[in-house]
A protein has these predicted regions:
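Short, small-residue-biased leader/transition segments that mark boundaries at the very start
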Residues: 1-7
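A charge-rich, low-complexity, intrinsically flexible signal that marks solvent-exposed coils, linkers
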Residues: 22-144
Length: 144
């Protein structure tokens, strides 16, 4: 039942050794309530550039959705002022091409979905904080 799933998830979090993070990073759970899986090491993604869509309170953009980017998504993001194509070495950002996996901002992905250009999502590697902005049902429609 749904209630027992919530209980199991809460129990797992409490008993899981990674629950307490000294770095201020929020606990690493995905939108399915399981341990967060890596998103990409090539290119190396994540707010912390650790390959995962981890987040903390300083990540105002919530870079938490693990996507396999597409040309329509990249063009949409650029039109919105979020250029994910052009390399920015000072931010350790290589620039993305279609097929790359990247932790994108939850609001950018939500806006792209509303515009009909959402890209595929890896649910296992998408941080649960994404659910502040995007419904699980919508994410599931674009699951890899």
């Amino acid at each position: 039942s749904a209630g027992s799933d919530v209980y199991k998830r809460q129990t797992y979090r409490i008993n899981h050794p990674r629950h307490v993070m000294s770095s201020g990073m929020l606990p690493s759970f995905n939108v399915l309530g399981e341990e967060l899986e890596p998103c990409s090491s090539d290119p190396l993604t994540g707010w912390f550039r650790d390959g995962c869509c981890n987040t903390d309170r300083n990540d105002r953009g919530l870079h938490t959705v693990c996507c396999q980017v597409t040309t329509p998504f990249l063009e949409f993001a650029r039109q919105q002022g979020n250029d994910l194509i052009t390399p920015a070495p000072r931010f350790n950002f290589p620039g993305l091409k279609p097929g790359d996996r990247w932790c994108v901002c939850a609001q950018t992905w939500q806006d792209a979905a509303e515009a009909g250009v959402a890209c595929p999502v890896d649910l296992g590697a998408t941080h649960e904080e994404s659910l502040q902005i995007i419904s699980l049902e919508l994410l599931e429609q674009f699951a890899l």
